[in-house]
Amino acid sequence: MQAPPPEHCPGVESEQAGLVSACAGCPNQRICSDPNKKLEDPGKALVAAAMKDVKHKLLILSGKGGVGKSTVTTLLTRYLARSYPDSNFGVLDIDICGPSQPRLLGAVGENVHQSGSGWSPVGIDDNVCLMSIGFLLGSVDDAIIWRGPKKNGMIRQFLSEVDWGTLDLLLLDTPPGTSDEHLSVVSYLRDDSAPDSLKAIIVTTPQEVALLDVRKEINFCKKQRIPIVGVVENMSSFRCGNCGNSSEIFPAKTGGAAAMCQEMDVPLLGSLPLDPQVTRACDSGEDITAINNSTTEALATICSKIMASL
């Protein structure tokens, strides 16, 4: 029988299992550090029990920072919640060092409460809830300076100790790249008996400097056996509010997301414009999905494809 994992356990699937300072004194240290032993992370069973009523999990990924993953996560959540009022949606912010969902969803200053069932996520709308480390900080300016094992422990807590209730879809906002956060959340949520329960959306901008890293993220998903719902091209164009002309702020010199999707055999879900209304709404935490403009028209197409894929 395995002992409970220490608070900052790196996870038995990690290359650091049994080797980092958090493992000191753990009864399983010798077993975890044995390269010939393959163990199931005891935290995985706790996560599975806590997430049993969450039907679908959707990772929002990108290899590049600054492409708008968090903004896209917010827009998708808002539009889906408005379009499917009888469904329940959750957002989990696992960008541990840069949590932005409380700001984007208008929940700055909210507190997380604890009950016998665990942490209660913050309610955003009637059918939307949010959990983020941003709610656990003393100030929005507090820096989180953690190594991988501590991030892993925090993600495990979010997945196993938050009372999500019954959700039709949980969207997970991730940091850029393929780092500890990504490996942790995939190891806990991937279920080989239900491979379609965890899927991914990739966010990019049109220019090649972003596409270079996004290709790596797509390959990460393929290696980790995570089905890719498709790619969202963000900030594809900018329409001037004065003259009405459209401009390419990030020129697609190599064909943009469309060419990359064809090259890598993944679907293109759609393109979102660079919209000043969205920028202002993100800063204030307002919901703009009720208005009719080019952004919401694009969201309608993207969200219908997402729901059809689940």
UniProtKB/Swiss-Prot annotation:
Q: Identify the keywords attached in UniProt to this record, alphabetized.
A: 4Fe-4S, ATP-binding, Cytoplasm, Iron, Iron-sulfur, Metal-binding, Nucleotide-binding
For this protein, the record's HAMAP family field holds: Mrp_NBP35, NUBP1
Which Pfam families is this protein grouped with?
A: ParA
Where does it live in the cell? Cytoplasm
Q: How is the cofactor bound?
A: Binds 4 [4Fe-4S] clusters per heterotetramer. Contains two stable clusters in the N-termini of Nubp1 and two labile, bridging clusters between subunits of the Nubp1-Nubp2 heterotetramer.
Question: Where would you say this protein principally sits, based on its record?
Answer: cytoplasm
Query: What InterPro entries does this protein map onto?
Result: Mrp/NBP35_ATP-bd, NUBP1/Nbp35, P-loop_NTPase, YlxH/NBP35
* Family classification: Belongs to the Mrp/NBP35 ATP-binding proteins family. NUBP1/NBP35 subfamily.
What are the binding positions for [4Fe-4S] cluster 2 in this chain? 240, 243
Example GO BP: iron-sulfur cluster assembly
Protein residues bound to [4Fe-4S] cluster 1: 9, 23, 26, 32
Question: What do we know about how this protein assembles, alone or with others?
Answer: Heterotetramer of 2 Nubp1 and 2 Nubp2 chains.
Q: Which cofactor does it need?
A: [4Fe-4S] cluster
This protein's record includes keyword RNA-binding: no
Q: In its keyword annotation, does this UniProt entry include Iron? A: yes
The record lists ATP as bound by 63-70
Can you tell which superkingdom this protein's organism belongs to?
A: Eukaryota
**Which organism's genome codes for this protein?**
Drosophila mojavensis (Fruit fly)
Gene Ontology MF annotations: 4 iron, 4 sulfur cluster binding; ATP binding; ATP-dependent FeS chaperone activity; iron-sulfur cluster binding; metal ion binding
Q: Write out the GO cellular component annotations.
A: cytosol
Q: What is the role of this chain?
A: Component of the cytosolic iron-sulfur (Fe/S) protein assembly (CIA) machinery. Required for maturation of extramitochondrial Fe-S proteins. The Nubp1-Nubp2 heterotetramer forms a Fe-S scaffold complex, mediating the de novo assembly of an Fe-S cluster and its transfer to target apoproteins.
User: What is the official name of this protein in its record?
Assistant: Cytosolic Fe-S cluster assembly factor Nubp1 homolog
Its encoding gene is what? Answer: Nubp1
